[in-house]
A protein has these predicted regions:
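Long, amphipathic alpha-helical surface segments
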Residues: 2-17, 23, 32-37, 43-50, ...
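A structure-centric signal for secondary-structure junctions around beta-strands
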Residues: 22-25, 74
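Helix-turn-helix-type domain boundary/helix-start signal
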Residues: 37-38, 67
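Active-site nucleophile-His-acid catalytic modules used for acyl/amide transfer and hydrolysis
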Residues: 54-93
Length: 141
């Protein structure tokens, strides 16, 4: 099996970002045709778990206040950071300075107001309302 995998990687290449193959199909990894095959639910859950773990690790290492939050508030902040991006591409979560400052003071009402007073909240609508309610109340919405 290792020989086959090595041969396939040599022939197909290993591409970490999506690209269009020689016939125009969106492809990723080692010849995975995203247009026709996509990914399985298990693969999506694997990617989600990895991405959430990276997001939580980043939040813990970047914001000392994050670990002081209740689990519900940590989940809300993680959801928001996951959506906005933290380090790759054009991340927006680091730009929410007033929101971060309110959380660092455990001023959850102000954090809610500052989170909702944003372009992001307008873009995601109900998601922002739900997350900011969780942050203010410490309870799942």
């Amino acid at each position: 099996m290792d020989t086959l995998l090595d041969m396939l990687m040599r022939h197909e290449g290993v591409r970490i970002k999506p690209y269009h193959d020689t016939v125009g199909k969106l492809t990723i990894g080692v010849g995975r045709n995203l247009d026709d095959v996509g990914i399985t639910r298990d693969e999506a859950m694997y990617l989600l778990n990895n991405d959430v773990n990276k997001t939580v690790a980043w939040l813990r290492s970047t914001y000392p206040w994050f670990s002081e939050l209740s689990p519900v508030r940590q989940d809300a902040v993680t959801d928001m950071a996951f959506n906005l991006g933290t380090t790759e591409g054009d991340p927006k979560f680091p730009d929410f300075h007033r929101f971060h400052e309110a959380l660092s003071r455990h001023d959850y009402k102000a954090a809610r107001e500052r989170g909702l007073d944003s372009k992001w909240a307008t873009q995601v609508g109900q998601r922002a309302n739900e997350l900011m309610t969780m942050i203010e109340t410490g309870m799942y919405a």
